[in-house]
Amino acid sequence: MTTTTTKFRDVEIRAPRGTELTAKSWLTEAPLRMLMNNLDPDVAENPKELVVYGGIGRAARNWECFDKIVDTLKNLETDETLLVQSGKPVGVFKTHKDAPRVLIANSNLVPHWANWEHFNELDAKALAMYGQMTAGSWIYIGSQGIVQGTYETFVEAGRQHYNGDLKGRWVLTAGLGGMGGAQPLAATLAGACSLNIECQQASIDFRLRTRYVDEQATDLDDALARIDRYTKEGKAISIALHGNAAEILPELVRRGVRPDMVTDQTSAHDPLNGYLPVGWTWEEYRERAKTEPEAVVKAAKQSMAKHVQAMLDFQKMGVPTFDYGNNIRQMAKEEGVANAFDFPGFVPAYIRPLFCRGIGPFRWAALSGDPEDIYKTDAKVKELIPDDEHLHHWLDMARERISFQGLPARICWVGLGLRAKLGLAFNEMVRSGELSAPIVIGRDHLDSGSVASPNRETEAMQDGSDAVSDWPLLNALLNTAGGATWVSLHHGGGVGMGFSQHSGVVIVCDGTDEAAARIARVLTNDPATGVMRHADAGYEIAINCAKEQGLHLPMITQ
């Protein structure tokens, strides 16, 4: 079938606010608003090209598909389900009222063909779309979506390496895109200074405007002078520096500069679209990507090799160094850096004990558009979890420092048991009128039971099951059976084609009894799959959690 395929449109998209429906129910209004919110200019990295974040992570395959998704959601009945294939609406089928209203599959390829070369061929023919994680699953909330995970990582690194105190210390990193843009604020909240290298001035401007980064240095000498001053004063200030990390990190090594922590969150997962080769302008990079993609990929990976070698050099100095999930080690290894994996990924180094208890990036958004609805839910979280000072501290910092992007939203790492408790409470707040409109609850695909990614979330599993991807498939199937409002199954998010499979879930709190039943099922089952997955791998923390929570795991708890 021949269709027009427009990827650029000079238009501004914003989700509707308030209580007036544009669809037939809140269960279809919610995905409609969250799709549009993904493309809000205050949220998305390049909304006019449908790019939400992460290189080319899109919300819809092209503008014609976007228009048709919007039209279909507005007219979808309460017992119908829309199927979306790589950003294209392909079918509406009769299901039932407790079934998902939308089922999404993005970027999935048969394993032998699961590489960037084949994907890019399909993308050029308008046959596929890269959905990243929350771009194509319509639950991206801006950089806040990863702030707490990054904060938890920095805090745990501080506990392990610096006796829990990052005051007077600094983090060296790069990348200020939709994901990397969380790093400077997360470091500040954790008590550390940070130097954040970014090759696009527009991305720096975005983070300055949204208060995720505090200030910009004029050059490297100025940046180091600021770092020296602020660390001596014990101030946690974030500094952006315009430049190329593959040039600046080796220069810092040459100078003998010693940060207190080194990581990276450039879009290294996508060498064709997300990592600027040394000596190139961004305009040259984008133009040559169209005409000589193989040469561009080669040049980008050569620069990544220099970047990773510098990170290895910092590690040799004794600096805690870790990968933050962008697959840069893999790219460098393919370019000849044989020991690229000598420094660990952040999940096995700092986060896995949380995953073993089903704890991960629980998030919610206020469909009303009213920030007061989020502040009321913040208070409810504190009320229902009264003894978690760390969580209360996070919520206080988030309210003070995090600017809402698009529809007001909050992220809060909680696990099995508490997710359902909070979801049911939010639903009751909608029912009682305490909240002015329904709430949507979702999460990142980066969660305990929803992803297989051997170079990131499932790196170094103790039983060697890093690459087993049955788990995210089971997670998606169970959330569908449980009655989530929309469920997604993606490939390649975070680390690129061939390196991950993962699933997403969103559920609407509309204040009804039917919603309460769905919430209780979905928000219990979803984190429980994470406990199950880690218990199956032999982690004692997960096994104990499964027993404490009464999970029925036939080979473990029975």
Swiss-Prot record:
Keyword Cytoplasm: yes
Cofactor: record remark: Binds 1 NAD(+) per subunit.
Pathway(s) per entry: Amino-acid degradation; L-histidine degradation into L-glutamate; N-formimidoyl-L-glutamate from L-histidine: step 2/3
Chain sites annotated for binding NAD(+): 54-55, 132, 178-180, 198, 244-245, 265-269, 275-276, 324, 494
Record-level Gene Ontology MF annotations: urocanate hydratase activity
InterPro entries: Urocanase, Urocanase-like, Urocanase_C, Urocanase_central_sf, Urocanase_CS, Urocanase_N, Urocanase_Rossmann-like, Urocanase_sf
Broad enzyme group: lyase
One BP annotation, GO: L-histidine catabolic process to glutamate and formate
GO cellular component entries: cytoplasm
Keyword presence, Aminoacyl-tRNA synthetase: no
Domain of life: Bacteria
Subcellular location: Cytoplasm
NCBIfam families: hutU (TIGR01228), PRK05414.1 (NF003820)
Family: Belongs to the urocanase family.
Name listed for the protein in its UniProt record: Urocanate hydratase
Record lineage: Bacteria, Pseudomonadati, Pseudomonadota, Gammaproteobacteria, Moraxellales
